[in-house]
Amino acid sequence: MDYKLVIFDCDGVLVDSEAIGNRFISEALTLAGIPISAEGALSQFLGGKLTQIKEDAEKQLGFSLPSNWVDEIYKKQFSEFRKNLKSIDGIEDVLDVLERINIPVCVGSNGPLNKMEVSLGVTKLRDRFLGRIFSADQVKKPKPAPDLYLYCADRMGVPPQHCLVIEDSPRGASAGVAAGMSVFGYSGGEDNSALKEVGCTKVFDTMQEIATFLDN
């Protein structure tokens, strides 16, 4: 194991936010005229960027959504995060192992920095990544393009081939693979076939399994 940097996706890897976030996306899309369940939104948009979801919806609808459409969804998400958001079970174990074996960590998410400020703050994970939280807003193209993960590696001063990405979505895992990095898929016990198909080095059901693997 020759990892010199571990890059974590945020939603669904560090914080258990995907179900909460996609509930409000499904409500907003249904109201706009694109009926979709929370489960459907989670399946379709996992790891996606909200501004891109808005653009795709506008193409499907044939008209523009309100300019504050994205901001209103974030406002609802943030309110719910502050009340109910939890960290992913076992993520502290992974971070503890990496700290003990002196492998640096950072965050690379398609979400905006202010969203991570809320989600990582609420779950008390922010201090573990101070100054090392990066967003797709800082690069030209979001995941599944490799731009963000290459940016993370550059900012952290580590060659891509020595980076490990931990992802829960095929979209994000594809970005890590395209960047020339090793990628661990985290399935949370759900169907992991899509993560395997995009080229994850390994796929794990739990964070405890990842912690044990890294500790050996």
Spell out what each predicted region is.
Residues 1-4, 96, 112-216:
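Asp-based, Mg2+/Mn2+-dependent phosphohydrolase catalytic module
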Residues 14, 87, 105-108, 165-166, ...:
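Conserved SAM-binding loop
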Residues 11, 46-47, 107, 171, ...:
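Short glycine-rich loop/turn motifs that provide flexible caps or phosphate-binding loops at active sites
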Residues 2-100:
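N-terminal helical cap/lid subdomain that shapes the substrate entry/recognition surface
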Residues 11-12, 21-23, 63, 73-76, ...:
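A generic short-segment signal for beta-strand/edge and adjacent turn/coil regions
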Residues 34, 63, 103, 158, ...:
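Short glycine/serine/threonine/alanine-rich loop segments
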Residues 45, 49, 73, 86-90, ...:
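Short beta->alpha linker loops
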Residues 13-14, 42-43, 82-83, 104-105, ...:
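A generic structural signal for short
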